[in-house]
Amino acid sequence: MRAAGQLLRACSQTWKSVRMASTGVERRKPLENKVALVTASTDGIGLAIARRLAQDGAHVVVSSRKQENVDRTVATLQGEGLSVTGTVCHVGKAEDRERLVAMAVNLHGGVDILVSNAAVNPFFGNIIDATEEVWDKILHVNVKATVLMTKAVVPEMEKRGGGSVLIVSSVGAYHPFPNLGPYNVSKTALLGLTKNLAVELAPRNIRVNCLAPGLIKTNFSQVLWMDKARKEYMKESLRIRRLGNPEDCAGIVSFLCSEDASYITGETVVVGGGTASRL
């Protein structure tokens, strides 16, 4: 009888766990009370990441170059019961980077997580035709500003005993997208930046990892998929024969920023449907 009772209790507990997992009741929050900054987070991949980090318990500060985008996103995510605030931030401007960090510190006491997602691409064509102005803009925002944004949060992370930086690169770093040469080059640079920062920041208990999304269906990438013939050609190169969704990137970012990934640093994870991804 005693054994039967123990078995019944075990079955009951197992069923309770399954039911909680399927309904979302008491969902585990691996980022509980962490403070996360996500740049370029009012649309596409950045928005999906911001939402997931908040769902996993983080206090998230979103940002965009336009106030109306920030206001809309904050209202939407707060309406979902998430702890989200936001501010305007052009990552290429020092005063904007400082304001973003200051908001997190003033509202939540510090910074634990940085997701560096901001990027630009003002050029489509042969790489040899890209002007010096194009190169300067792309490298300034996509690479230099990523370094400076990281530099801005490191002192705050140190005060809290460490942190996690997640840099968003692209599968174009490995397998160049056609007609996006300067953009591809900037994203390849981020792979090296991730490795260097990981080595230098490890003694401060700050981990640095990288996400390389493949062809994800966003407004930013529409030049690659709006044309039906090009879209089908791109899909043929994938093992998983579909375009990715922003949400496909969000879970892995949350994992890399959590304690579950505490022994992972300097790595790049490709979310690309099987796209070739080796330098």
Curated annotation (Swiss-Prot):
<dbReference type="InterPro" id="IPR002347">
    <property type="entry name" value="SDR_fam"/>
</dbReference>
<keyword id="KW-0560">Oxidoreductase</keyword>
<feature type="site" description="Responsible for the stereoselective reduction of 3-ketosteroids into 3alpha-hydroxysteroids and benzil into S-benzoin">
    <location>
        <position position="180"/>
    </location>
</feature>
<keyword id="KW-0007">Acetylation</keyword>
<comment type="function">
    <text>NADPH-dependent oxidoreductase which catalyzes the reduction of a variety of compounds bearing carbonyl groups including ketosteroids, alpha-dicarbonyl compounds, aldehydes, aromatic ketones and quinones. Reduces all-trans-retinal and 9-cis retinal. Reduces 3-ketosteroids and benzil into 3alpha-hydroxysteroids and S-benzoin, respectively, in contrast to the stereoselectivity of primates DHRS4s which produce 3beta-hydroxysteroids and R-benzoin. In the reverse reaction, catalyzes the NADP-dependent oxidation of 3alpha-hydroxysteroids and alcohol, but with much lower efficiency.</text>
</comment>
<dbReference type="GO" id="GO:0042802">
    <property type="term" value="F:identical protein binding"/>
</dbReference>
<dbReference type="Pfam" id="PF13561">
    <property type="entry name" value="adh_short_C2"/>
</dbReference>
<feature type="modified residue" description="N6-succinyllysine; alternate">
    <location>
        <position position="217"/>
    </location>
</feature>
<feature type="binding site">
    <location>
        <begin position="37"/>
        <end position="61"/>
    </location>
    <ligand>
        <name>NADP(+)</name>
    </ligand>
</feature>
<feature type="binding site">
    <location>
        <position position="170"/>
    </location>
    <ligand>
        <name>substrate</name>
    </ligand>
</feature>
<keyword id="KW-0521">NADP</keyword>
<dbReference type="GO" id="GO:0008202">
    <property type="term" value="P:steroid metabolic process"/>
</dbReference>
<dbReference type="GO" id="GO:0005739">
    <property type="term" value="C:mitochondrion"/>
</dbReference>
<keyword id="KW-0576">Peroxisome</keyword>
<feature type="modified residue" description="N6-acetyllysine; alternate">
    <location>
        <position position="217"/>
    </location>
</feature>
<comment type="subunit">
    <text>Homotetramer.</text>
</comment>
<keyword id="KW-0597">Phosphoprotein</keyword>
<comment type="similarity">
    <text>Belongs to the short-chain dehydrogenases/reductases (SDR) family.</text>
</comment>
<dbReference type="InterPro" id="IPR020904">
    <property type="entry name" value="Sc_DH/Rdtase_CS"/>
</dbReference>
<feature type="modified residue" description="N6-acetyllysine; alternate">
    <location>
        <position position="93"/>
    </location>
</feature>
<feature type="binding site">
    <location>
        <position position="187"/>
    </location>
    <ligand>
        <name>NADP(+)</name>
    </ligand>
</feature>
<feature type="short sequence motif" description="Peroxisomal targeting signal">
    <location>
        <begin position="277"/>
        <end position="279"/>
    </location>
</feature>
<feature type="site" description="Important for the maintenance of the quaternary structure, the catalytic activity and cold stability">
    <location>
        <position position="196"/>
    </location>
</feature>
<feature type="site" description="Responsible for the stereoselective reduction of 3-ketosteroids into 3alpha-hydroxysteroids and benzil into S-benzoin">
    <location>
        <position position="177"/>
    </location>
</feature>
<dbReference type="GO" id="GO:0004090">
    <property type="term" value="F:carbonyl reductase (NADPH) activity"/>
</dbReference>
<protein>
    <recommendedName>
        <fullName>Dehydrogenase/reductase SDR family member 4</fullName>
        <ecNumber>1.1.1.184</ecNumber>
        <ecNumber>1.1.1.300</ecNumber>
    </recommendedName>
</protein>
<dbReference type="GO" id="GO:0001523">
    <property type="term" value="P:retinoid metabolic process"/>
</dbReference>
<feature type="modified residue" description="N6-succinyllysine">
    <location>
        <position position="228"/>
    </location>
</feature>
<dbReference type="InterPro" id="IPR036291">
    <property type="entry name" value="NAD(P)-bd_dom_sf"/>
</dbReference>
<feature type="modified residue" description="N6-succinyllysine">
    <location>
        <position position="235"/>
    </location>
</feature>
<dbReference type="GO" id="GO:0052650">
    <property type="term" value="F:all-trans-retinol dehydrogenase (NADP+) activity"/>
</dbReference>
<feature type="modified residue" description="Phosphoserine">
    <location>
        <position position="221"/>
    </location>
</feature>
<dbReference type="GO" id="GO:0000253">
    <property type="term" value="F:3-beta-hydroxysteroid 3-dehydrogenase (NADP+) activity"/>
</dbReference>
<dbReference type="GO" id="GO:0042574">
    <property type="term" value="P:retinal metabolic process"/>
</dbReference>
<feature type="active site" description="Proton acceptor">
    <location>
        <position position="183"/>
    </location>
</feature>
<feature type="modified residue" description="N6-succinyllysine; alternate">
    <location>
        <position position="93"/>
    </location>
</feature>
<dbReference type="GO" id="GO:0005777">
    <property type="term" value="C:peroxisome"/>
</dbReference>
<dbReference type="GO" id="GO:0042180">
    <property type="term" value="P:ketone metabolic process"/>
</dbReference>
